[in-house]
Regions:
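Bacterial Sec-dependent N-terminal signal peptides
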Residues: 1-26
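Macromolecular interaction modules
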Residues: 18-135
Length: 135
């Protein structure tokens, strides 16, 4: 009986440790990297197809940049800073690169590809900011 309980405890510990290690890590950014943030402003008459953005546009971005793109995250605006106020942005995309040149090289080669894809998911002119990751 003690052997069976001991074996059960070992099996449970292995199962739990496997589940914890299989979770994807979002720690792909580090100090000194470049973060390109794409803001999609909210407002009357503005539209944004989050499904298309997630399932079509961002995979396109990943294919274009390949290994130069170190990671990405997507935010969906759900509210403003005060209760019952709309989000200032419908969506925000964050792209991480080792340096500005890695971002600019892919953009120069594929600017038209990205521009042609914008109308498929939004009628908004995005606002882009390039930042250095500090922490």
């Amino acid at each position: 009986m003690k052997t069976k309980i001991g074996l059960l405890i070992v099996m449970l510990a292995l199962l739990i440790s496997c589940q914890q290690s299989s979770a994807p890590s979002l720690a792909f950014h580090k100090k000194g990297m470049i973060k390109v943030t794409i803001f999609y402003p909210n407002g009357e008459g503005k539209t944004f197809d989050m499904d298309y953005y997630i399932n079509k546009h961002m995979p396109l971005v990943q294919r274009v940049y390949g290994n130069a793109l170190k990671g990405l995250t997507i935010d969906k605006g759900i509210g403003g800073g005060s209760p019952d106020t709309p989000a200032p942005y419908m969506a925000i995309g964050h792209l991480y690169f080792e340096n500005v040149a890695a971002y600019e090289e892919g953009l120069k080669k594929n600017r038209e590809t990205f521009a042609a894809d914008f109308p498929k998911y939004t009628n908004v002119m995005p606002v882009v900011q390039i930042s250095e990751v500090i922490r």
